[in-house]
Amino acid sequence: MSFNSTSKELIEQNINGLLSIHDSWLRISMDSVANITNGFAFKSSEFNNRKDGVPLIRIRDVLKGNTSTYYSGQIPEGYWVYPEDLIVGMDGDFNATIWCSEPALLNQRVCKIEVQEDKYNKRFFYHALPGYLSAINANTSSVTVKHLSSRTLQDTLLPLPPLAEQKIIAEKLDTLLAQVDSTKARLEQIPQILKRFRQAVLAAAVTGRLTKEDKDFITKKVELDNYKILIPEDWSETILNNIINTQRPLCYGVVQPGDDIKDGIELIRVCDINDGEVDLNHLRKISKEIDLQYKRSKVRKNDILVTIVGAIGRIGIVREDINVNIARAVARISPEYKIIVPMFLHIWLSSPVMQTWLVQSSKEVARKTLNLKDLKNAFVPLPSIEEQHEIVRRVEQLFAYADSIEKQVNNALARVNNLTQSILAKAFRGELTAQWRAENPDLISGENSAAALLEKIKAERAASGGKKASRKKF
């Protein structure tokens, strides 16, 4: 619950690489260049979400940058936060942000930091602060939640470049980090675009548009309850029960699995079926006796699994022969290979139209449940076996292409996330302004030097009787 190091020790450790400074710079305590105001303990009985009174910033609002809490009680002086004010959460992760919403009151466990801009550049301060907060957080012990004291903030030794250099660094960081954020935002949109692409591929696959060479092929209309789809006229129509191996009928699995048995038989549950696949890495295990009672629901290679309780419509395919059973919330479909290609059935069940049908066909009991009777009667389009194989080939080819792009995007995102840290570290080592310093020696020397700035700050403090920057508290 307490901070375990001094600011000097943090700087020596420099665990996040953001506490370095250029050898021409100095350091100064935060309370020498900023005023810290602790939040007030406003009565929670006066809080409301009806917009009665004035907005109030609670610690949960720091990262959001806005609040839905209002305070209707008496307002003491000195606890207002205005747009562009810097606030810090004093519990948990010690987050800092620039407040961009309407004026609001400062509640307890949030502090406001007002930079004395004749001594320190506000934007430079904002870029520097998170690295120190992160280091403080890493060196703060806790039983439940970590707490940050304003005394720790006051004593934090910040980098002190010349004022002109602070301004240049802040401007460079504003530009570079905005570019990083823009790049990151564009990259983060791509997985959603790829998701829509995959859905479009599935929709095209199950309506013949992926394989028909003549794009003006003749279609016929099929009605699925409230939905209508067009499929090629030369495709057959059937129901799910007609394409299931009669020796292994549609079924659900183990109703009461009992305890997790170390040397038992593995069991596939809803949580093990995601993104079209069955994850076999973390299966729970049931006793061999219970498994024997449910021999009917054992799985084999190429079985299709559908979740039918809770999260309706997750589809998975068993890729290998394994000694595994399924849970009550999972249905097993064993395709008749002479009629349907297992992966084509997987594609059909995963398609947007069937996913909608599965969800809307489920009934709300204690939890959403899809009855096996309804599932048996689900419509299935039937191209020729040859065309099914070709559909599967093309879908897998396009999905592999999308997967490759997604992997590249994830790698790029990882590099972009590291880029912010790298840029900040370079900035505070003075590397972003090396050329600027060489071109502007007069702005970093003499009366414009970091040493002169430090002496000026000390002199002003001495003239005011050694009084430190105010720290309001109640």
UniProtKB/Swiss-Prot annotation:
Database matches in Pfam families: Methylase_S (PF01420)
Annotated keywords: DNA-binding, Restriction system
Record's keyword annotation contains DNA-binding: yes
Statement: the UniProt record of this protein carries the keyword GTP-binding: no
GO molecular function, one term: DNA binding
Role played: The specificity (S) subunit of a type I restriction enzyme; this subunit dictates DNA sequence specificity. In the presence of the R subunit the complex can also act as an endonuclease, binding to the same target sequence but cutting the DNA some distance from this site. Whether the DNA is cut or modified depends on the methylation state of the target sequence. When the target site is unmodified, the DNA is cut.
Domain notes: Contains two DNA recognition domains, each specifying recognition of one of the two defined components of the target sequence.
Assembly information from the UniProt record: The type I restriction/modification system is composed of three polypeptides R, M and S. The restriction enzyme has stoichiometry R(2)M(2)S(1) while the methyltransferase is M(2)S(1).
Note: Type I restriction and modification enzymes are complex, multifunctional systems which require ATP, S-adenosyl methionine and Mg(2+) as cofactors and, in addition to their endonucleolytic and methylase activities, are potent DNA-dependent ATPases.
Similarity annotation: Belongs to the type-I restriction system S methylase family.
Protein's recorded name: Type I restriction enzyme EcoBI specificity subunit
Organism name: Escherichia coli
